[in-house]
């Protein structure tokens, strides 16, 4: 499966992580290549969308412009990959620089979005405080339970959130649905926008990617 590893060009650690991620994908059937990420400095080169009303991104816009522009840059990377998925007319994987491939892709069948790192995602320090984490079954399953849900008062409210966007696969159908929602309602923080109201979310175990490197936390600026 064509796999795009997001990194920031010129950021030494980001480039090192990206190279390690691609190396981990060797002989895995994840056909990985670098994908230069958008930054606040290059954001104006891409189509601009308004943020959804009463959402997470709107809070950042009023409270911290730097974080807002960084979050918007991160989201734009997803949009570019979704468009690439439709252009290629085949499933692709979105993988962040600090992810590591741990097993071979075996052409799992999924509908729209498949979380590729479900077990390690919930073990991230950011979720240490989260209670009632989901019990995960072997194989591909619908993402029907999560303690992470959308709390803001808009059309996404009460949907289940993807537990970060470290590694996921998406089909052209899933990409089209997310882009349609974007055009209609606007954008939000990436792991708030990819939710169960917007797209059919599924997970797979054993997972294909995990975290072995320290999180650079680049979604909050760098």
PLM ranges: what are they?
Residues 1-95, 99-222:
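An acidic/histidine-cluster motif and surrounding catalytic segment
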């Amino acid at each position: 499966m064509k796999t795009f590893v997001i990194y920031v060009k010129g950021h030494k650690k980001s480039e090192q992580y990206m190279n390690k991620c691609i190396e981990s994908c060797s002989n895995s059937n994840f056909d990985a290549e670098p994908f230069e990420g958008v930054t606040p400095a290059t954001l104006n080169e891409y189509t601009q969308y308004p943020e959804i009303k009463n959402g997470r991104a709107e809070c950042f816009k009023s409270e911290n412009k730097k974080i807002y522009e960084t979050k918007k840059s991160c989201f734009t990377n997803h949009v570019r990959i979704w468009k690439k998925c439709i252009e290629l007319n085949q499933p692709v994987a979105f993988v962040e620089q600090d992810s590591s491939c741990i097993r071979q892709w075996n052409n799992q069948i999924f509908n729209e979005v498949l979380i590729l790192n479900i077990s390690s995602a919930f073990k991230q320090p950011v979720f240490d405080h989260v209670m009632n984490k989901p019990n995960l079954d072997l194989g591909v399953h619908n993402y029907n339970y999560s303690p992470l849900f959308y709390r803001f008062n808009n059309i996404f409210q009460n949907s289940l959130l993807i537990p970060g966007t470290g590694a996921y696969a998406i089909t052209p159908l899933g990409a089209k649905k997310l882009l349609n929602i974007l055009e209609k309602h606007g954008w939000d923080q990436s792991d708030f926008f990819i939710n169960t109201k917007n797209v059919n979310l599924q997970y797979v175990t054993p997972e294909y990617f995990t975290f072995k490197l320290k999180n650079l936390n680049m979604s909050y600026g760098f």
